[in-house]
């Protein structure tokens, strides 16, 4: 976001805030309204942000959400195809293990609509193409530490797991570490989401598990900044811009492996 603001330095003045919780973001939104912001690009990932975002919109500020769906009238949004990530991950799992087996799905309730949509795409697709698949859900978080801790417990509770539907590469890295630590060989597929060079390297080097990532470009936030500027210029802008996903696995990972890559 800051890179795009710098690129538009002749057109915009900007402030950049990072938030650790809903209360902090609410205070920052108030600060921006006092400052005189005409547009705000926000990532309101916590519950309870509907009213503060609506207040900003009602005061005449253009608000563009990065990825998160919230119940606010007049908000714009640039998003990855979160539901499509779930759809493509479900298809990948079925392609590798068939239409029966046990799949552990790892939703992340704290991520709001991101997790909800990725899970919806996955569960709807599994019901359609593999209705006999046994899907077990365990909540986790988008960190490798949580992936390791939670999946260590999951492995202890489940003697047979055929595939793992993980929503994020960071979680998947922790899951893979838990599998290695436990010496398990039953798991044949692990998905991920986002895309990063460390995970791409694991995809290439791990030949015992089919590992994939549904790409989710961080450059979308730059497009959110561009959308905000376009709205302020009075240009016609669709309220929602969805960026499609791509599956990366062993068959095409070489196209994405690049130590100098600044996107993934």
Protein language model regions, located:
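Short, solvent-exposed amphipathic alpha-helices that sit
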Residues: 1-8, 85-89, 113-133, 146, ...
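Early extracytoplasmic/lumenal segment of secretory-pathway proteins
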Residues: 11-34
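Structural recognition of the beta-strand scaffold that forms the well-ordered cores
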Residues: 14-16, 39-43, 62-67, 77-79, ...
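Short beta-strand elements at the ligand-binding edges of bilobed clamshell
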Residues: 16-18, 70-94, 105-109, 137, ...
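Hydrophobic alpha-helical segments within soluble ligand-binding/sensing domains
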Residues: 25, 78-103, 117, 145-148, ...
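Hydrophobic alpha-helical
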Residues: 26-34, 38-58, 122, 136, ...
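Flexible loop/hinge segments that line or gate small-molecule binding clefts
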Residues: 46-84, 88, 102, 196-208, ...
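Hinge/cleft segment of the Venus flytrap/periplasmic-binding protein
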Residues: 114, 125-129, 216-264
């Amino acid at each position: 976001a800051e890179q795009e603001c710098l690129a538009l330095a002749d057109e915009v003045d900007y402030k950049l805030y990072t938030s650790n919780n809903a209360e902090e973001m609410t205070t920052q939104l108030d600060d921006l309204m006092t400052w005189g912001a005409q547009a705000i690009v926000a990532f309101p990932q916590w519950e309870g942000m509907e009213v503060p975002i609506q207040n900003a919109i009602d005061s005449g500020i253009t608000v563009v959400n990065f990825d998160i769906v919230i119940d606010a009238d007049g908000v714009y949004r640039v998003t990855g195809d979160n539901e499509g990530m779930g759809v493509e991950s479900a298809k990948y799992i079925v392609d590798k293990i068939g239409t029966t087996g046990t799949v552990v799905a790892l939703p992340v309730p704290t991520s709001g609509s991101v997790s909800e949509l990725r899970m919806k795409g996955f569960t709807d697709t599994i019901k359609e193409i593999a209705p006999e698949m046994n899907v077990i859900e365990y909540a986790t978080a988008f960190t490798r530490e949580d992936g390791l801790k939670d999946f260590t417990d999951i492995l202890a509770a489940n003697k047979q797991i055929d595939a793992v539907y993980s929503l994020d590469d960071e979680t998947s890295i922790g899951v893979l570490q838990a599998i290695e630590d436990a010496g398990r060989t039953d798991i044949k597929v692990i998905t991920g989401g986002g895309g990063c060079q460390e995970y791409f390297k694991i995809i290439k080097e791990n030949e015992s598990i089919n590992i994939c990532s549904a790409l989710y470009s961080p450059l979308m936030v730059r497009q959110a900044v561009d959308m905000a500027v376009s709205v302020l210029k009075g240009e016609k802008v669709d309220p929602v811009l969805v960026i499609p996903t791509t599956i990366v696995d062993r068959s095409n990972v070489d196209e994405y492996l690049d130590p100098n890559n600044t996107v993934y």
